[in-house]
Amino acid sequence: MEWSLTQSKLLAFHRLMRTDKPIGALLLLWPTLWALWVATPGMPQLWILAVFVAGVWLMRAAGCVVNDYADRKFDGHVKRTVNRPLPSGAVTEKEARNLFVVLVLLAFLLVLTLNAMTILLSVAALALAWVYPFMKRYTHLPQVVLGAAFGWSIPMAFAAVSESLPLSCWLMFLANILWAVAYDTQYAMVDRDDDIKIGIKSTAILFGRYDTLIIGILQLGVMALMALIGWLNGLGWGYYWAVLVAGALFVYQQKLIANREREACFKAFMNNNYVGLVLFLGLAMSYWHF
């Protein structure tokens, strides 16, 4: 594993891991924090919290590397991705593979400090991270796999805290899948024309002219499931206000994507960071109050 770590190469690795674009890490972080706060409840151990926060960053970076590796033959034909490190030649295929291995090993070393159940679940997390980028070649539902990959930290968090996977865990996991399909469809709407030309599949293409309607239905599903989690765990009204604020953000996103303009769809996608934040704040304040 020989690398020439020049400043330009380090910058290329930085871009390949998307450390300059934290939105993906944040969309992975919020459900992880939801799970830790519900599982504890409201008082996660500092070390477990640190392991999951660091693990989120490492696995998101690894996911970006394997995603670009899988798409390296396609990205050169898409306006938004033509200058990414792999299609531009700033990073070689071997360097990308090596970087992926290093990131995954670091994440696994962190997981090894947790219990056996969490370690076993981490194997599935790796499988999902590896499989997702290739799904867009074979199915119009890669966003479902993305939702499972981004949400797998939820059962891992419950396992790390209690070595159990209660109903709230799976409801939250399902809510995260619905949310991920909604926001990644918004993201896919940005590249829809290019994806059709080069044969990449997505829910944005599958949903067609019903895209905004289906996104809205998915968003309602997220709100219903998150409200049910609140009821099951006896959370206070502050949490339900947070769910309503998240709903208002979804309405705003619907307004943005109504005309299906690229910049507006991307703005709607980015707005989901606030959805995750608001729901976490609702959980944190509810547990703090009690």
Curated annotation (Swiss-Prot):
The chain crosses the membrane at residues 23-43, 46-66, 99-119, 141-161, 163-183, 212-232, 233-253, 268-288. Its EC number is 2.5.1.39. Its main location: membrane. GO terms for biological process: ubiquinone biosynthetic process. Gene3D superfamilies: UbiA prenyltransferase. It catalyses: all-trans-octaprenyl diphosphate + 4-hydroxybenzoate = 4-hydroxy-3-(all-trans-octaprenyl)benzoate + diphosphate. It holds the Pfam family UbiA. It is an enzyme of class 2 (transferase). HAMAP family: UbiA. Belongs to the UbiA prenyltransferase family. A mutant in which deletion of the last 50 residues is combined with the 'Tyr-56' mutation in rsmG is highly resistant to streptomycin and has a small colony phenotype (which grow slowly and are resistant to aminoglycoside anitbiotics). This is 4-hydroxybenzoate octaprenyltransferase. It comes from Salmonella typhimurium (strain LT2 / SGSC1412 / ATCC 700720). The gene is ubiA.
